[in-house]
């Protein structure tokens, strides 16, 4: 794959998939890493059918595991391979989209980090003293309302929010999603918008919803720092990041017996299979609660 091929793949990720620049760079790095592996193991990278196979890709995954790559890297590599296959198919470089079952073995899996409802309440309880406080409060409430992902959140524009009816519309890959908001997130966003007006921040319908101190849309790094700052303020032992926050919402919805299909819709998941890890975490939590509720020590009091 030459320089022009990589550029074409990058353009595909941006124009067709609407990925952020950070995601595009990650996919390109993963693909280059794969090609280095293929070349060092005697594969001809230009002969796509020789290596875009279930056996070869799973051998590569085993190589990554042996070299202690994280579960997150393995999962992203799986996504990269699938998206690259779609790209090759869409560009008619291959005639059939390969059906590759990529296996991530259990030793690469890890338990989800789930915040309790009390911890979530603490995180959401932000003293709104400054403009950034109002912004951060709105971001956390929105994240816990619908489990919105970082790229989706930072790309929101003022015109994407309808607080009268109570919904937001945002781009998800090559389509738009319209999602209803809960009362708390509507109130938090409305208070944030009022604070923007009070501070005379110039905004328009096309302005980004969440702004930095320069009045520009916050970056992915800035978004990440908001979560790190809150973790430090509360001295949380669990890592507070966007994924753990989203995972917590999913498990709490399932705990409240929200139908699986509704949880899938709220989180914007493509299929119910994506909920497997959440259901597994919920079962583990319930098992622990049962164990302690029936523990013999309780009868000794």
Per-range role (PLM):
Residues 1-301:
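Conserved catalytic core of the tyrosine transesterase superfamily
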